[in-house]
Every structure is written in structure tokens, then in C-alpha cells.
Design a protein with these regions (language model features):
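Formylglycine-dependent
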Residues: 1-65, 69-80, 232-240
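Histidine-centered active-site microenvironments of extracellular/periplasmic hydrolases
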Residues: 3-9, 76-78, 88, 112-166, ...
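Loop/turn elements at helix/coil->beta-strand transitions in domains of secreted/extracellular proteins
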Residues: 9-11, 59-65, 119-125, 216-218, ...
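Substrate-binding rim/cap in mid-to-C-terminal beta-strand-loop elements of soluble/periplasmic
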Residues: 15, 20-35, 108-116, 142-199, ...
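Active-site rim elements
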Residues: 35-41, 93-97, 166-176, 190-196, ...
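A long, amphipathic alpha-helix that forms part
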Residues: 48-56, 83-122
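C-terminal, low-complexity/hydrophilic appendages and adjacent surface loops
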Residues: 147-152, 223-284
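Long, internal low-complexity/basic segments
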Residues: 182, 222, 228, 264-267, ...
Length: 325
């Protein structure tokens, strides 16, 4: 939503700003868009309190609530009463586990509030994450790597949808979708459409939710990141190398096939996710026709979207060995 969510059409902004992580999960929060509570108040609890107040205020009106809990994000600071439960468990990170339980608890509070306000049957509830977990704290197996990576451990996350009377409870769908699909889906659900001239990269997944209508099989999804993401100073996370979480490149997925291209050395990594979900065996040499077809698709998309691709090497760059797996 950027530095100021209200510039994107949001009417009320509570605690949202350009930072992806809080200064502290305990008050005082040092957040310009959230008044401090009593000393020691826990951020996840406080944000849920604020969300419930908003629900109560607008329960008789149509509303859209975008509620990105800061949790579970660094700094890892679990609520003290929950952290105590995990201190003697050597198999888990006590703060991390406490933060997960607190998040789960507060999602339950939010759902209970919808029920109590009579909003359950007329509200679409969608829960997901913007990335995979931090591998050194929580392995994503069988997916490779973790947050910040193009590998499945970094970009594959579950989505849970509750929509009484529309989405069948307990049903599942294996069709890959992306966060870019949420906005057009919500528009479709309320019978609306984008503003004239508005170009959307995603598409409505309403047919997948309702089981009605058609949805393109094996559509192509793209990820493009032409810069470096964080020097990890050798921390092992199963990414392409231990130096950076992500290096400049583009990734494409079409059906069971996934293609990585890295700009520094032109490396092409081709994986069959159906038979190799952990992305361990590069098929670029074994499947030249498939590689070429996906590469042409990728290049055409970059041209169509005018995606930037770095063309000049940093004069201070010192080549180092990079994995080709």
C-alpha cells in the first residue's frame, strides 16, 4: 500500500507505513500512525482491537478491510505469557512459536467478531501470506529455500478463503494463483469492474472459488526482480548462493514447469515442479525445446510490460562461484 495507504483509496489507516516491520511488538511502538497503548501492550492484540472497532462502526455498510498483521516478522518478540510455553522445547524457537500462536488467536478473535456482528454470511474472508518463512527459523520443506527467494520456499504460500454459501467448506484447489488476482476477484465478487483504462496484471479467480465458469488452465505467472536483495553474509538458506537472498532475474511458471533466468551470468534453470517440487534437478540441458518455449514466453512478457533488465555490470563487481543447480 506504499508509505500512505490513504493515497491508494483507503479511508482509514491504522499503523500502516512504509516499514515492513515494527520497531517493537510492545508499546511504545514508535509508529507515527498508531498511538501508543499502555506500556507492554502487545501489537498483534492491539491491531485486532482496532480492527474490531472498525467492524463495529461500519457493520451496516459495505466495507473492505486490508489487515496485514506485522506478525510474524522480525523483530522476533513473542508475547510473554505465550513464550513461556515454549522455552523448554528445544525443537522450536520460543519467540517465533509464541508469535504464531498469538496470530492464530487474534485471527480467531476477528472471526468471532464477524459472527457476533452478524457479518459472517455476507463477508468474504481471505487469509494468506506475502512470502514464505525465514528458512533458518522455519524450514519450508519440501520446498527449497525461503523468504526472499525465487524458489518455491520463498513464493509458494497457501490461501484460505471463507465465503459461506459460495465456497464449499473443506474444499481444496491446486491451481496456482497470485496476490495480483485478489483485487480483480473482489471486484468480480461484488459485480463491479476496473475503472476505464485501468490495466490489471491479475485476473478474477471467482470461477475457482465458486466452481462456476471457466479459468485458463496452465496460465503463465511471472516474477521479476532486477536488483539484489540483502547480503546474507553466508547464511545457508538453500537459495542459489549464500551471498544474497535474491540476485537480479526473472522467473516464470507455466503449469508444472518453472524457469529461472539470472541476469549476472545468464543462467537458465528449468524445473519440473510436479516431479521435482524441491527444485533440485536443473533440466535446462535435457529439455531444450521446453526451455526455448518458456524463454520466448518470458522475453515476450518482459518486452510487453517494459520490464527493466540491467545491461551494465557494476565496475566494482568481483565474480564469484555461483551454483547452477
Amino acid at each position: 500500500m506504499g508509505e500512505d495507504p490513504t493515497a491508494q483509496g483507503i479511508d482509514i489507516n491504522i499503523a500502516g507505513n512504509s516499514r515492513g516491520s515494527p520497531s517493537s511488538y510492545f508499546s511504545p511502538y514508535k509508529n507515527p500512525n498508531l498511538k501508543d497503548g499502555p506500556k507492554g501492550e502487545y501489537l498483534t492484540d492491539r491491531l485486532t482491537d482496532e480492527a474490531i472497532i472498525i467492524l463495529e462502526k461500519f457493520k451496516d455498510d459495505p466495507f473492505f478491510m486490508y489487515f496485514p498483521f506485522y506478525s510474524i516478522h522480525t523483530p522476533l518478540q513473542g508475547r510473554k505469557d505465550l513464550k513461556k510455553k515454549y522455552l523448554n522445547n528445544k525443537l522450536v524457537h520460543a519467540d517465533y512459536a509464541a508469535m504464531i500462536e498469538c496470530l492464530d488467536e487474534n485471527i480467531g478473535r476477528l472471526m468471532a467478531a464477524l459472527d457476533e456482528l452478524g457479518l459472517r454470511d455476507n463477508t468474504i474472508l481471505l487469509f494468506s501470506s506475502d512470502n514464505g518463512g525465514i528458512r533458518k527459523l522455519s524450514k519450508q520443506d519440501p520446498w527449497r529455500a525461503g523468504k526472499g527467494s525465487y524458489y518455491e520456499g520463498g513464493i509458494r504460500v497457501p490461501i484460505t478463503v471463507r465465503w459461506p454459501g459460495v465456497v464449499e467448506p473443506g474444499s481444496t484447489c491446486t491451481e496456482p494463483v497470485t496476490g495480483l488476482d485478489f483485487y480483480p476477484t473482489f471486484l468480480d465478487a461484488i459485480g463491479s469492474s476496473p475503472s476505464p483504462g485501468k490495466i490489471l496484471d491479475g485476473r478474477s479467480i471467482l470461477p475457482l472459488l465458486t466452481g462456476k465458469g471457466s479459468f485458463p488452465k496452465d496460465r503463465t505467472l511471472y516474477w521479476h526482480f532486477p536488483v539484489y536483495l540483502q547480503n546474507y553474509a553466508g547464511e545457508e538458506d538453500q537459495s542459489r548462493d549464500a551471498k544474497f537472498r535474491t540476485r537480479p532475474g526473472t522467473v516464470l511458471r507455466k503449469g508444472k514447469w518453472k524457469l529461472h533466468e539470472y541476469f549476472e551470468d545468464g543462467a537458465l534453470l528449468l524445473y519440473d515442479l510436479e516431479n521435482d517440487p524441491g527444485e533440485t534437478h536443473n533440466l535446462a540441458q535435457e529439455k531444450p525445446k521446453k526451455l526455448q518455449a518458456l524463454k520466448e514466453d518470458m522475453y515476450a512478457w518482459r518486452k510487453r510490460t517494459d520490464s527493466p533488465v540491467p545491461s551494465k555490470r557494476n565496475p566494482k563487481y568481483i565474480p564469484q562461484k555461483i551454483s547452477t543447480r
